[in-house]
C-alpha cells in the first residue's frame, strides 16, 4: 500500500525556462506533485524512483488562474510544485523519462 502511494506522488516534471536553468546550474529538479503530499513523501518517492540522494526540498502551492470566455468565468485548479535539490554527483534525466 505504501509503495503504491509513493508511485502516485509525482504527477510530472515541470518543464519551463526557469526549471531548466535551475537544473543546469544548481542541480535542482522541479516536479508537479499531488496536493496532499508532504516533503517526506516527496523525498521517499524521488529516492525510490530515481535512485538519488536529496539535499533539500522546497514545496509551494501555485494558485490557479481565473480564465474567462465571454461571459463565463472559470478557474484553473491549484497545484503543488516541489523544488528538489540533489546532492553533488547525482543527476536525473527528466527529458528522456518514460511515463
UniProtKB/Swiss-Prot annotation:
Q: Does the keyword Ribonucleoprotein apply?
A: yes
**Record SUPFAM superfamilies:** Ribosomal proteins S24e, L23 and L15e
Q: Name one GO biological process term.
A: translation
User: Which GO cellular component does the record give, naming just one?
Assistant: ribonucleoprotein complex
Molecular-function GO terms, alphabetical: rRNA binding; structural constituent of ribosome
Which keywords appear in this protein's UniProt record, sorted alphabetically? Ribonucleoprotein, Ribosomal protein, RNA-binding, rRNA-binding
Would I find NAD among this entry's keywords? no
On assembly, the entry states: Part of the 50S ribosomal subunit. Contacts protein L29, and trigger factor when it is bound to the ribosome.
- In which family does this protein belong, per the annotation? Belongs to the universal ribosomal protein uL23 family.
Under HAMAP family, the record lists: Ribosomal_uL23_B
Entry function: One of the early assembly proteins it binds 23S rRNA. One of the proteins that surrounds the polypeptide exit tunnel on the outside of the ribosome. Forms the main docking site for trigger factor binding to the ribosome.
Q: What name does the UniProt record give this protein?
A: Large ribosomal subunit protein uL23
